[in-house]
Amino acid sequence: MNYQNEQNAYQMQNQENVPPMSYGYPMPTPEQFQKMSYGQNFQAPWDMQQQIQMFQQYHQNFQGGYSDPFTYQNQYAHQPKIVTVTLQDPQDLWKELHYLSNEQNVLNNGRKIFPALNYKVEHLNPESNYKVEILLRRMVPYQIQYSNGSWSRKNVQSKKTIAMKTEKVFVGEFTGQDIMRTGLDLSDVKVFNIGSDNKKKVTPYEEMSDAEKREYDTQYSKKKTSMLEVSNECKYIPVLIINEILPNQELRLVGEFENEITQFATVSSYKNHIVKALRTAANPTSRGDAKQEAVQVGKQWRSSNKSLLESLRPSMICTSVSTTAPSTNFHAPLQYPGTSSPSSNFAPMTPSTSFDSAYSSFNVTSSTPEQMCYNPIPSMSTDYSFCSFDSATSSPPLQPTATSPEASQNQIKLEMNQYM
């Protein structure tokens, strides 16, 4: 590496938009890569070996373009960031109702979720198509009851089995550009139920006549495709599901997102009169004296609780509850040239985690089913650098050999200094 290249590397190393290279060392030259990967007495950390593999692949397959791997590495700093979903609540209605323990009135013929669910989505691929769905997840595995101004666990066991998740309801297919420009408006999403333990007895399906069964099946199937089936006296939270539609029409999960302030209890009639007033006052379909009265009740309540409401600062950013991605990471694991696909069992790593603490967190000679790996390109997911491999399905492409983590760690530092 000549002096000019060293200067270029140093400048790139210190650009704000380029994170530190692996373990804080500058990116090696192709010649140093060659020594690292094939030298008899040197074993680089295997995350560095992933970089070696990536850049060897680059030099073998990339025709023309960048003159050195530093420019190639820098391109990753400009990749889309982690997908974020933010709940839109311009009137603070979700915040206020969450403080009061929100309630959602449910009828057999369906009711729209209110307040409306509106989301802002950032960092999608503008040229990709996305499939958007929604479901409701139960917050607790038991029914609840309202008593003495608060909700508590219901002592009576339900006679029917209540699913912990509803079926998904299709919202639509959109381009990433449209979603990011206009957001996602889910104001038409409805919830329904098919009776309650506290209501008049419903004829069991087994006791219906054939004609009644056909009618029931027809109506039920229509509801299930357009509405979310819930049970009364349960606490639910909406979960937004975004899948990228790949060129082969397969789906890649981007994330399943929820915000805690959108949870609600399903009821056949409102229990808290303040909740009812706030919802009635804000609902554009409400009319007449009932709405005027609700507006006055809402004003009085907000006035008497002004300082409290101003102190409430709930996060509008949705968290990911995806089963194929960690709650703090919204992307599938990055795959590098020539590597196996890692599994989705992540453990988060903070940007402040040092090399010593990171490296000592796993045993490089371990033969256990799961091996920890460090993301060789931190700019792709700076906050979430650890992932694990499941040896039953895949394995790390390269691994260091050492007698102990401590010895390997010291040897790596010494030998990297030698080559750098």
From Swiss-Prot:
DNA-binding positions: 93-291
Compositionally biased residues, Polar residues: 395-412
GO biological process terms, semicolon-separated: cell fate specification; positive regulation of DNA-templated transcription; regulation of transcription by RNA polymerase II
Keyword Nucleus applies: yes
GO MF annotation list: DNA-binding transcription factor activity, RNA polymerase II-specific; RNA polymerase II cis-regulatory region sequence-specific DNA binding
Stored PROSITE patterns: TBOX_1 (PS01283), TBOX_3 (PS50252)
Gene3D superfamilies: Transcription factor, T-box
Classification via SMART domains: TBOX
Location relative to the cell: Nucleus
Top-rank taxon, per record: Eukaryota
Region feature (Disordered): 395-420
Keywords associated with the record: DNA-binding, Nucleus, Transcription, Transcription regulation
Name of the gene this protein is made from: tbx-33
InterPro entries: p53-like_TF_DNA-bd_sf, T-box_DNA-bd, T-box_sf, TF_T-box, TF_T-box_CS
Main location per the UniProt record: nucleus
The protein's name: Putative T-box protein 33
GO cellular component: chromatin; nucleus
Native source species: Caenorhabditis elegans
